[in-house]
Amino acid sequence: MPLNKKVLAIVLAGGEGNRLMPLTADRAKPGVPFAGSYRLIDFALSNLVNSRYLQIVVLTQYKSHSLDRHISETWRMSTQLGNYIASVPAQQRVGKSWFLGSANAIYQSLNLIHDANPDIVVVVGADHVYRMDFAQMVEQHVASGAKATVAAVRQPLNMADQFGVIEVDQENPQKIAAFVEKPSSTPGLAADPTQFLASMGNYVFDADALVDALHVDAERLDTKHDMGGDIIPYFVNKGEAGVYDFTLNDIPGSTERDRTYWRDVGTIDSFYDAHMDLISPMPVFNLYNSEWPIYTRQSISPPAKFVRGQGNTVGTALDSIVASGVVISGGIVEGSVLSNDVYVGTASRVVDSVLMDKVQIGEGAVVNRAIIDKNVKVPAGAAIGLDPERDRARGFKVTESGITVLSKGQAVPEPDEAERALSAANLHLVPNAIKAATENYPAARDSAAKVGEAHAAAVGVSSND
């Protein structure tokens, strides 16, 4: 970071997150729990803090109570040293409207920029999963002479309608020649025709230039008051917009496999996929990089516990992330992420799923390819994620790709005989990880099969059922 530049960071955290419903029915999108112990906003804030930017304001609006509480309980800075992370809701300082867009959110909060009097303003989104050293981006911004710089990541061409698309100047690859927000199609890169440069929603501005642009935008009638749709094109048209290639960002402790990882988790399917990215032995995104930690609120729950259940059934978790306070009592968890204080009962199975805080899985229940929000109780013998039509009939959301989603505290009806039979048919199955490990060892494979039979028998299901 240039030592003679004062930097203020602004985190845009007012998003409603309609595409993440029902996970956002009771909270703002940046406040959605993620990866067992975190909330989505922790990634943006950790990246800023690790970049040594310690004057941060978080602009909130939509159902922000849990998000504001998380920030106040987790992100306590040393104000005696002039550092702070302040959650700032819409205040109607300019007119009587709430935030009308991301640019309007900053415009209505210009007092924060005036009070901090920075040279540089870093603006970031609050709902992406990645690691990034913003100091490296600021360094390029200052050296290039640009007034605005956009961080860019390569994406497949078929995703152009989901992002702001950047075309670079042919003579100066650090300069933006054109910027189009979510076009129906776009040409590919010269170096790789199958990809395009997408805006990451992270920006660096000269502070005075940003303030001027926001005033101009506020006076326009033909604007959506959007950072990507209106403010960045303003700088592009003036020839003052630069681009920062995310692949140049160098994070301590990163691997070739995860150093350019970036996920927009704005949909249920992408949110689910991001969790599945975490659980392999060599994950696409490594949560365990201690040189660039992702910070969050420390749990007061005790360590996780794996114990035998009824009938001497073995409690185990394979290829999974298990947070504090989890108790797996004779159940099997595979390829899943379990948040704090989850309980998994005797002979139950949780496969390829995401369970948030205090979810309870009853005896002999089966959960498959599901996301279950906080405080849901799954009764004994229930089957979730095995029959999409049955799930929809009970009021659960099922995505086109087959992910079943239960909202916070949603009631799960007691299973009927057909549902109990459906779950019972899955209790004998040997976990995929054990199948792979015992493939060439018949005796071990037979032993694993007997474990499955014992689990089923513990809840009164025979191998012939």
From Swiss-Prot:
**MF terms in GO:** ATP binding; glucose-1-phosphate adenylyltransferase activity
Per the record, the domain of life is Bacteria
Sorted UniProt keywords: ATP-binding, Carbohydrate metabolism, Glycogen biosynthesis, Glycogen metabolism, Nucleotide-binding, Nucleotidyltransferase, Transferase
Please give the catalytic activity noted in the UniProt record: alpha-D-glucose 1-phosphate + ATP + H(+) = ADP-alpha-D-glucose + diphosphate
Please list the coiled coil stretches.
Answer: none
**Which pathway does UniProt place it in?**
Glycan biosynthesis; glycogen biosynthesis
Q: Under which EC number(s) is this enzyme classified?
A: 2.7.7.27
Give, as one word, the top-level EC class. Answer: transferase
Instruction: Quote the InterPro entries the UniProt record gives.
Output: ADP-Glc_PPase, ADP_Glu_pyroP_CS, GlgC_bac, GlmU/GlgC-like_hexapep, NTP_transferase_dom, Nucleotide-diphossugar_trans, Trimer_LpxA-like_sf
Binding-site residues, alpha-D-glucose 1-phosphate: 164, 181-182, 199
Q: How does it assemble?
A: Homotetramer.
User: Which PANTHER family does its entry note?
Assistant: GLUCOSE-1-PHOSPHATE ADENYLYLTRANSFERASE, GLUCOSE-1-PHOSPHATE ADENYLYLTRANSFERASE-RELATED
* UniProt cross-references to NCBIfam families, sorted A to Z: glgC (TIGR02091), PRK00725.1 (NF001947), PRK00844.1 (NF002023)
What protein family does this chain belong to?
Belongs to the bacterial/plant glucose-1-phosphate adenylyltransferase family.
Task: Please give the name of this protein.
Answer: Glucose-1-phosphate adenylyltransferase
Q: Which organism is it from?
A: Arthrobacter sp. (strain FB24)
* Gene label: glgC
